[in-house]
Structure formats: structure tokens, C-alpha cells
């Protein structure tokens, strides 16, 4: 057995792709447009690691997804937690849980999916502007 992917439903595919690809840094590795089923599947992966994938499911017709099915969060290891958070901020993403400890941060996708970022190799030295920033909203 091997892990394949985690599926998340999105309400605006273009906005979601800007978040996951441009801001977070994932890349699109496969896309399936199903005219009969009226949906699009987009598979994303971190550069250099296509084994762990996120599947964005976009239904062409409006649907109310309601509260998730006990879904927690997506998590990614990053080479530089501060650079990753700055990149997200530069794309207009709110850092809900700043990396005050130099190790962990949380943001939310356009569809309110919680995304955790963890510093590769353990904590970095805490530094400003991050170490004095409070949490913002839910994470």
C-alpha cells in the first residue's frame, strides 16, 4: 500500500491555484476535466516530491460544502519558514499563526483549509517581525 493524495473541495479554482501554486509554491502535475461529471480535478505536489499530492476538486455547478468532514489540515516541510511566510504574505495571505518560535506557522486557503508549515531540521532562531506577532483568526 502507498499514500496517494488528499482531496480538498474548492469553490473557485483560479483563486485556489493562485494560493496553492503562486503563494504556497506547489506545482500542478496533472489535470482532469470531466465534462460528463461537470468537475475538474487538479493534482498538486511540492517541487521535487510528487509522491504526496493534494487533489483540488472543483465542481462546475455551485454546491454548498458545509462544515468539513472532520478534516484537520495539510502540512508541508519548508526549507526556510520565514521566507515561506513572507512569500505567502507578499501574495496577500494572512499568516494566522506566525512562526514566532522559528518552527511552525499556519495559514488558510481561499476555501478555509488550514495549512501548516514546519521548518525543516527543527526551529530557526526566533526573529522579528515574526516573533512578536499575535495569532490572527482561526488556524
Language-model features: where?
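Active-site/binding-pocket entry motifs
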Residues: 49-50, 62, 123
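Vicinal oxygen chelate
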Residues: 2-11, 29-32, 41-46, 62-139, ...
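Core segments of cupin and vicinal oxygen chelate
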Residues: 7-51
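A generic fold-level signal
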Residues: 1, 36, 51, 66-69, ...
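Short, mixed charged/polar active-site loops
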Residues: 51-53, 114
Amino acid at each position: 500500500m502507498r499514500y496517494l493524495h488528499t482531496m480538498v473541495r474548492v469553490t473557485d479554482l483560479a483563486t485556489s491555484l493562485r494560493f496553492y501554486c503562486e503563494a504556497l509554491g506547489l506545482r500542478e502535475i496533472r489535470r482532469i476535466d470531466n465534462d460528463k461529471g461537470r468537475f475538474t480535478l487538479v493534482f498538486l505536489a511540492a517541487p521535487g516530491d510528487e509522491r504526496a499530492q493534494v487533489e483540488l476538486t472543483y465542481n462546475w455547478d455551485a454546491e454548498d460544502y458545509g462544515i468539513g468532514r472532520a478534516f484537520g489540515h495539510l502540512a508541508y516541510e519548508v526549507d526556510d519558514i520565514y521566507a515561506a511566510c513572507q512569500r505567502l504574505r507578499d501574495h496577500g495571505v494572512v499568516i494566522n499563526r506566525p512562526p514566532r518560535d522559528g518552527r511552525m506557522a499556519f495559514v488558510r486557503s481561499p476555501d478555509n483549509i488550514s495549512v501548516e508549515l514546519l521548518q525543516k531540521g527543527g526551529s530557526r532562531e526566533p526573529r522579528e517581525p515574526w516573533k512578536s506577532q499575535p495569532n490572527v483568526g482561526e488556524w
